[in-house]
């Protein structure tokens, strides 16, 4: 049982220590073996500590990479958010401009309708003042159509045209 324990827990250490003892052949082999085992244990502890530190450093490196990726994602999200805010603000400005343009058009339409009503009222007043006699007082169709909203008709002067009977007489004379 003691040999199994020694073999299991001290096998490699004792084997290497005895091999070193045989190679060096010190004056006091027991003291040399004790110091060698002490140094072996110290080296094993240092190696274990170094591996733990390496594992810790690897873990910290992974955490740093994850934090860096998270920061990049946050920056990307922030840029996207800023871009969306800018687009939203531009859209609001466009809507405001469109609303102002519509209000301006409505005001212009109201002004136009007001002027049209006033013009119609003025025409109605003129018609009532002149009466129906005034309408037959010699105004031509072109003069009547000069009012606001009436079609623009050009004046046509009448030329003296020969009558059909005059043309027939001329033909008879030629024969």
UniProtKB/Swiss-Prot annotation:
Keyword Zinc-finger appears in the UniProt entry: no
Domain of life: Eukaryota
Matching Gene3D superfamilies: cAMP-dependent protein kinase regulatory subunit, dimerization-anchoring domain
Membrane-spanning parts: none
InterPro entries: Dpy-30_motif (IPR007858), DYDC-like_DD (IPR049630), Sdc1/DPY30 (IPR037856)
Keywords: Cell projection, Cilium, Cytoplasm, Cytoskeleton, Flagellum
GO cellular component labels: motile cilium; radial spoke; Set1C/COMPASS complex
Protein's cellular compartments: Cytoplasm, Cytoskeleton, Flagellum axoneme
A Pfam short name: Dpy-30
Stretches assigned to coiled coil: none
Similarity comment text for this entry: Belongs to the dpy-30 family.
Subunit structure of this chain's protein: Component of the axonemal radial spoke complex 1 (RS1), at least composed of spoke head proteins RSPH1, RSPH3, RSPH9 and the cilia-specific component RSPH4A or sperm-specific component RSPH6A, spoke stalk proteins RSPH14, DNAJB13, DYDC1, ROPN1L and NME5, and the anchor protein IQUB. Interacts with SH3GL3.
Role according to the record: Functions as part of axonemal radial spoke complexes that play an important part in the motility of sperm and cilia. Plays a crucial role during acrosome biogenesis.
Name of the protein this chain belongs to: DPY30 domain-containing protein 1
Organism: Bos taurus (Bovine)
This protein's encoding gene: DYDC1
């Amino acid at each position: 049982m003691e040999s199994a324990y020694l073999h299991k827990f001290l096998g490699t250490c004792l084997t290497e220590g005895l091999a070193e003892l045989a190679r060096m052949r010190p004056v006091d082999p027991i003291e040399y073996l004790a110091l060698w085992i002490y140094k072996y244990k110290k080296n094993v502890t240092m190696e274990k500590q170094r591996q733990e530190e390496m594992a810790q450093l690897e873990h910290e490196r992974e955490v740093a990479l994850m934090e860096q990726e998270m920061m990049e994602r946050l920056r990307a999200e922030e840029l996207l958010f800023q871009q969306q805010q800018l687009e939203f603000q531009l859209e609001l400005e466009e809507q405001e401009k469109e609303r102002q343009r519509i209000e301006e058009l409505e005001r212009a339409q109201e002004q136009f309708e007001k002027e049209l009503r006033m013009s119609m009222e003025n025409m109605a007043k003129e018609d009532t003042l002149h009466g129906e006699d005034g309408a037959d007082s010699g105004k031509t169709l072109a003069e009547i159509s000069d009012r606001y909203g009436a079609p623009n008709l050009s004046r046509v002067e009448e030329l003296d045209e020969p009558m059909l009977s005059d043309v027939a007489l001329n033909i008879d004379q030629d024969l």
